[in-house]
């Protein structure tokens, strides 16, 4: 469920088809994102999932869509 929502948001932000995105999709290598893109997406997810502010050390560990889904899943359980 979390992964599907994130895939939809990533597809909207990067204007690509949802079917082109998997958990293994790399923000930088596959989508051409930079760190600011990841921060913007994370901020949108914080709002969508009512998450606290994402610590900077967590952001440095988010490289793929799956990494982001794992973080959101952990954060929503806390």
Model-identified regions with their sequence ranges:
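Phosphopantetheine-dependent thiolation modules in NRPS/PKS and related acyl-activating systems
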Residues: 1-33, 42-43, 47-78
